A protein has these predicted regions:
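Short beta-strand-to-coil "C-cap" segments at the C-terminal boundary of structured domains/repeats
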Residues: 141-144
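Non-heme Fe(II)/2-oxoglutarate
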Residues: 1-55
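Catalytic core of non-heme Fe(II) oxygenases with the double-stranded beta-helix
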Residues: 52-128, 132, 136-138
């Protein structure tokens, strides 16, 4: 698990505009069941300079409120390496012990997430998202 790029929201505004246009803000998602699938023409990982491949990746755009408990996706038709792009981060509920930023967990390691961070992680290993507020994300899945 690592941050591949940061500040993507400033450097790749056209990507963010396209993804945010397709975010259904009235739906709270658990990523797998309620995500909006992007069906447009943009190959986001190519636009972000991560992969220079012709075929598109499956893109799921989600609004998440609260934490996602530790889980393993391990979806057979997708490669284990997936990319998560943070579209926006809402304020936490600001409890006295609230975190300042959402935290992605995998393999005993935590990474704090900011708007515009592009993170690569292994979907077939246990991972979790800890946050007491809202976070909008796009997840890019590559077919095997």
């Amino acid at each position: 698990m690592q941050i591949v790029k940061s500040n993507c929201h400033n450097r790749y505004k056209h990507v963010f505009t396209e993804l945010r246009k397709h975010l259904n803000t009235s739906v709270i998602s658990d990523v797998n069941d309620s995500s909006q699938n992007y069906c447009g023409d943009m190959n986001f990982l190519k636009e972000l300079g991560v992969y220079n491949m012709k075929h598109k990746h499956h893109t799921m755009i989600s609004r998440i409120v609260g934490s996602i408990p530790p889980h393993v996706d391990d979806i057979y038709e997708y490669c284990s390496k997936v990319f998560l792009l943070v579209l926006s981060v809402g304020k936490g509920r600001e409890y006295r012990d609230s975190m300042d930023l959402p935290m992605l967990y995998q393999g005993g390691k935590f990474i704090s997430l900011r708007e515009g961070d592009l993170v690569a992680f292994n979907q077939s290993k246990e991972h979790a998202l800890f946050w007491d507020g809202r976070v909008d994300i796009a997840v890019f899945w590559k077919l095997r």
